[in-house]
């Protein structure tokens, strides 16, 4: 794995530029690339299942993505979706996935962390 964390302070508009740059650099070194872009935020408190569904639904709507499946993995609420506008995808069973939302409550900080990834979040929950 090669993981690069980039903190964007003025918005996420440049995200695709950084993704292209990472692919280009890794390909120049002959490294087969699989780039995942993830954005993380937090909401105060322990969100209810209903609120998680509402927030993830709004996020998917903004991306033009359709839900493939949702579920609970350990203590995390997980949404797998597909958006025609996102180029890369992975297959899970017969379904293509390229948008992944995970939400989990952090007791120490008292917040629900929300992670939006394309094509899929591939780190520990």
Locations of regions flagged by a protein language model:
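A cross-kingdom marker for long, charged
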Residues: 86-125
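Soluble, non-membrane globular domain cores that form compact, hydrophobic packing
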Residues: 13-34, 56-67, 103, 118-125
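A structural detector for beta-sheet-dominated domains
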Residues: 3-9, 40, 82, 104, ...
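Residue-level signal for the start and early helices of compact helical domains
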Residues: 30, 70, 81, 107, ...
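Intrinsically disordered, low-complexity segments enriched in Gly and acidic/Ser/Thr residues
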Residues: 42-95
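One face of beta-strands
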Residues: 2-4, 35-43, 79, 95-99, ...
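Extracytoplasmic beta-rich ectodomain segments of secreted or membrane-anchored proteins
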Residues: 1-49, 53
């Amino acid at each position: 794995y090669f993981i690069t964390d980039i903190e964007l302070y003025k918005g996420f508009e440049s995200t695709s530029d950084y993704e292209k740059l990472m692919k280009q650099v890794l390909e120049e070194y002959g490294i087969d690339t699989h780039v995942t872009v993830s954005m993380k935020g937090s909401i105060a408190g322990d969100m209810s299942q209903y609120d998680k569904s509402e927030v993830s639904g709004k996020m998917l709507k903004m991306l033009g993505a359709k839900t493939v499946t949702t579920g609970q993995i350990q203590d995390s609420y997980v949404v797998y979706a597909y958006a025609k506008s996102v180029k890369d995808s992975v297959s899970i069973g017969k379904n293509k996935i390229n948008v992944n939302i995970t939400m989990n409550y952090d007791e120490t900080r008292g917040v629900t962390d929300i992670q939006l990834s394309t094509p899929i979040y591939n780190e520990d929950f």
